[in-house]
Amino acid sequence: MSRLPDRSLLTRCEIFVYFGVYIAYIVVGLYKIYGLRDHIVKEAKFQFPEGWSLYPFSQRRRDDSNDELENFGDFIVSFWPFYLLHVAVQGFIRWKRPRLQCLGFIGVCALALSVNLDWSSMVLLVTLIASYYIVSLLSLKFLVWLLSAGWILCINVMQKNVWWTDRVGYTEYVLVIVTMSWSVLRGCSYSLSKIGAKQEDLTRYSLVQYLGYAMYFPCLTYGPIISYQRFAARREDEVQNWLGFVGGVLRSAIWWLVMQCALHYFYIHYMSRDVRMVEMMDSVFWQHSAGYFMGQFFFLYYVVTYGLGIAFAVQDGIPAPNRPRCIGRIHFYSDMWKYFDEGLYEFLFQNIYAELCGKRSSAAAKFGATALTFAFVFVWHGCYTYVLIWSILNFLCLAAEKVFKTFTAMPEYQRWTQRHLGAVGAQRLYAMLATQLFIPAAFSNVYFIGGQEIGDFLMRGAYLSGVGNYVALCFCSYCFFQCSELLLTKSDGRSKTKTF
């Protein structure tokens, strides 16, 4: 039993307590982070840049500690004309010659890269893209993975190549490394899909189709990863929804503005880099809120970047993955993987996990497949200690969640809880137990977002700060869990209503 059978079984008072605790903790935690703003500016290891010239931001300094967000801003400044060119070219092609859509993708991307990149960067990207088309002709999956291992090794070596970094500059270095990392996934998706395709479907895997996929500019550098199956299923003749497209782009722009405004007052990105700033909070209990908001700002970054790519993809007739789901609505870690980055989840599930085991495979085979999947996640994200810790914690949390769900699905467990606790009591017990999985899963993300130092600090605070602190943390996490369950039940109910 994992869901509330009927939301009306809970009293209004109980629901009020759950949401009251949730909202109060978030509001107070955010206020305490806001209260540290001047202390952080004074104690920071480097000086923040001047804020926007517009009042009242002109009186503040802006937190520029998040390299990914700053690099994205630099990318947009350099490449915004090519987003407009992409829209214009695709609008004309979809109107007059829909069959030339992929040539339009190739032309815009080739122009954008050739104008902005050094020749050495161009050689790297061209070689990577070409290598996957060549290996797909050999129809051997192990060669695809061998090639991918080689490129991932190359990317890790390039990250430490001072000569090349000095030659192209830091901005281009980041752009090329990130683009190559995404291109490895796109190359894998195309090659593995082609190898597994039926003979009559091979017309969908032509060179032009592949280059259009590999060089789709709106998702080239900042994602999301769109599987080749999705790309090949695009609807070239479909009427473009210009209003929906403008709305999608504006949504990303508005969230970017909201985040930039917030960074004049909430120095959460710097807090993720300097544990001393988190230590300045009133107590260990409120330090947990810093971890929560690190996750929320991380989520907003992907709402902006993925949202922009998804808006363009949908406009071009590509059935793109959904936008990231807010982490405040995710209470099982498996859902974090499924719904935060649907494109990456599809890639990992289809090309690694499902290739190693099936529904009827043994538990050992499934755990082994999960471990190998996270081994790939580790090397693809970069072979850093904090990524290794994050990957291991991800694996352990998902394995524990699988054991937990298997146990609570047993008829004996369900009969016992129903007999002694009733439907709602059984759900409360379920939530209390699941909270013990939710806490380490939530803190594991801090390793990926902020690094090992802040991850270790918050994890120690959760488990080594006394019984009272842990009980308070469990109670708040229990309320968070119940709120997410209530929202999910309501969302599922709406989906069923729409279906009927």
Swiss-Prot record:
GO biological process: dorsal appendage formation; epidermal growth factor receptor ligand maturation; N-terminal peptidyl-L-cysteine N-palmitoylation; patched ligand maturation; segment polarity determination; smoothened signaling pathway; wing disc anterior/posterior pattern formation
Topology with respect to the bilayer: Multi-pass membrane protein
Enzyme Commission no: 2.3.1.-
Location(s), subcellular: Membrane
Protein's name in the database: Protein-cysteine N-palmitoyltransferase Rasp
Reaction(s) catalysed (UniProt annotation): N-terminal L-cysteinyl-[protein] + hexadecanoyl-CoA = N-terminal N-hexadecanoyl-L-cysteinyl-[protein] + CoA + H(+); N-terminal L-cysteinyl-[protein]-C-terminal glycyl cholesterol ester + hexadecanoyl-CoA = N-terminal N-hexadecanoyl-L-cysteinyl-[protein]-C-terminal glycyl cholesterol ester + CoA + H(+)
Family: Belongs to the membrane-bound acyltransferase family. HHAT subfamily.
Physiological role: Required in hedgehog (hh) expressing cells for production of appropriate signaling activity in embryos and in the imaginal precursors of adult tissues. Acts within the secretory pathway to catalyze N-terminal palmitoylation of Hh; this lipid modification is required for the embryonic and larval patterning activities of the Hh signal. Not required for Wg signaling.
Cellular component aspect of the GO annotation: cytosol; endoplasmic reticulum; membrane
GO MF, one example: protein-cysteine S-palmitoyltransferase activity
Organism expressing this protein natively: Drosophila melanogaster
TM regions (residue ranges): 15-35, 73-93, 105-125, 134-154, 206-226, 243-263, 293-313, 372-392, 429-449, 461-481
Location, primary (coarse class): membrane
Listed PANTHER family: ACYLTRANSFERASE, PROTEIN-CYSTEINE N-PALMITOYLTRANSFERASE RASP
Keyword terms: Acyltransferase, Developmental protein, Membrane, Segmentation polarity protein, Transferase, Transmembrane, Transmembrane helix
Active site (record annotation): 381
